[in-house]
A protein has these predicted regions:
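Short, flexible loop segments at the rims of nucleotide/cofactor-binding pockets, characterized by
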Residues: 95, 113-115, 182-188
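Short, conserved phosphate/pyrophosphate- and ester-handling motifs at nucleotide-, phospho-/glycolipid
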Residues: 60, 142, 211
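Actinobacteria-biased recognition of intrinsically disordered, low-complexity terminal regions
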Residues: 1-24, 250-253
């Protein structure tokens, strides 16, 4: 006889919370059940909860975590890397930035049985199923979203992923499913030089995620190369010298 399925206790977010920007999301109570170092500066954190049983989301969406900061909390958004809604678990790949901020300090010291509150799912970026080719340009902060979206594509899809790394760590696990994509690791200057000479074919969909100025520059170069603006999805995860801009809410998407 199988064990009874856990019952979700997640609650809808009040319509007026954060000015109504969280409508359609849920309040979630999560427990940390797994921690693994998967690459330099990257921790894989696994959360579990009955609130995640049957939890539905679109690949690339995230949860807004209430991260402890002394006697207070602050909000940080982390992409759902993968999940098992039958078991009520979800994985998150979190960057460790040399311990400079409260969220980094929490992620670096996170331990089993830690409890956090979160809100989600969040985010409006989604794959374009009618595209004949998919181009991802992402930095370290956005790799979980790109990999999650890539794994949702059919195996016969044409996809290229340009990975912009700031600290030279090119051993991070990539997508485990989806198409046999082409992965190219670059620094910021290299990716902008490559994009300046790129002329995407008709039917290409581009997904530009990461630092705000990188996203803007990449978008301008792709448009100059002939790609229609409507074929480009953008999401700025952070701004240089401005941690937690907009309280964890992307400001350019």
């Amino acid at each position: 006889m199988s064990e009874p399925r856990p019952v979700s206790t997640r609650r809808p977010v009040p319509d007026d919370m954060l000015g109504g920007r969280l409508k359609g999301s849920y309040l979630l109570d999560l427990e940390l059940v797994g921690v693994d170092e998967i690459a330099p500066h990257v921790r894989l954190i696994t959360m579990a909860s009955s609130d995640l049983v049957g939890f539905e989301y679109t690949p690339g969406q995230d949860l807004l975590f209430e991260v402890p900061n002394g006697d207070l909390t602050l909000r940080r958004r982390y992409t759902i890397r993968r999940s098992d809604p039958a078991k009520g678990i979800a994985d998150f790949e979190i960057e460790i930035h040399d311990g400079r901020g409260p969220a980094t300090r929490w992620a670096a010291k996170a331990e089993l049985d830690d409890h956090l509150e979160a809100i989600g799912p969040r985010g409006g970026i989604s794959l374009r199923p009618t595209a004949t080719s998919h181009l991802f340009v992402v930095d370290d902060s956005a790799m979980p979203a790109a990999f999650a979206m890539l794994e949702a594509l059919p195996e016969d899809t044409n996809a290229t992923v340009l990975l912009v790394t700031s600290h030279g760590a090119r051993s991070r696990p990539a997508a485990a499913g989806g198409p046999a994509a082409s992965f190219v690791w670059l620094d910021r200057a290299e990716v902008l030089e490559l994009l300046s000479d790129l002329h995407p074919a008709a039917g290409t969909a581009a997904y530009l995620f990461g630092e705000r100025h990188l996203v803007r520059s990449a978008e301008e170069l792709l448009i100059a190369g002939g790609l229609d603006r409507d074929a480009i999805a953008t999401k700025a995860y952070w701004r240089r010298d401005q941690p937690n801009a907009s309280h964890g809410e992307p400001s350019y998407n």
